Amino acid sequence: MRQQQQQQQESRFKRTCVFCGSSQGNKTTYRDAAVDLAKELVARGIDLVYGGGSIGLMGLVSQAVYDGGRHVIGVIPKTLMTPEIIGETVGEVRPVSDMHQRKAEMARQSDAFIALPGGYGTLEELLEVITWAQLGIHHKPVGLLNVDGYYNSLLTFIDQAVEEGFISPSARRIIVSAPTAQELMDKLEEYVPYHDRVASGLNWETGHLGF
């Protein structure tokens, strides 16, 4: 308990946004990783922001964080707010009008981003917050929980894009990855944004995002 309280005091994050699949995947390691991440957030005194609902890895993370006594914010487009589609959401529900507002609200509420294994939606959310960091819209850390090497192919692709001149070496450093929740959180806690922003001279109107 003493160690847990110390971790809570030391964490730089109040809320972390977790992107993950609405499926649980085919391996138990994905489900275990989702619960481990939730426990790590609870141990560090960090609240959760996610896409809402109780299905897939999203449901596992949110339920474990909620059961651990932390606040959970589920951001859901009104069209999807039916039990048949997303199940029941624990904690606080914040309805939004569409998918674009969902991502903006999730980003506004969060101090960091983590992607668990997931599909198209997870990748789209992940790549958008990486792009926002590259453009200087935010300076929040972005982490990949690379469970069983799930994201190895994506990281290889990004490294190839660096080699081919489409992503700068400094922008490659935006992405923080680790195979376990504890290691990833340690890296995110230490993260300092030192990449060269692509559009550093621009004055983004980001008040609606809270950046």
UniProtKB/Swiss-Prot annotation:
Catalytic activity entry: N(6)-(dimethylallyl)adenosine 5'-phosphate + H2O = N(6)-dimethylallyladenine + D-ribose 5-phosphate; 9-ribosyl-trans-zeatin 5'-phosphate + H2O = trans-zeatin + D-ribose 5-phosphate
Tell me a Gene Ontology molecular-function term this record carries. Answer: cytokinin riboside 5'-monophosphate phosphoribohydrolase activity
Residues involved in substrate binding: 84, 102-103, 119-125, 131
Keywords assigned? Cytokinin biosynthesis, Hydrolase
**Which GO CC terms are listed, alphabetically?**
cytosol; nucleus
What EC number(s) is this enzyme filed under? Answer: 3.2.2.n1
Q: In which tissues is it expressed?
A: Expressed in roots, leaves, stems, tiller buds, shoot apex, immature inflorescences and flowers.
One Gene Ontology BP term is: cytokinin biosynthetic process
General function of this protein? Cytokinin-activating enzyme working in the direct activation pathway. Phosphoribohydrolase that converts inactive cytokinin nucleotides to the biologically active free-base forms.
Q: Which family does it belong to?
A: Belongs to the LOG family.
Q: What is this protein called?
A: Probable cytokinin riboside 5'-monophosphate phosphoribohydrolase LOGL3
Name the species this protein comes from.
Oryza sativa subsp. japonica
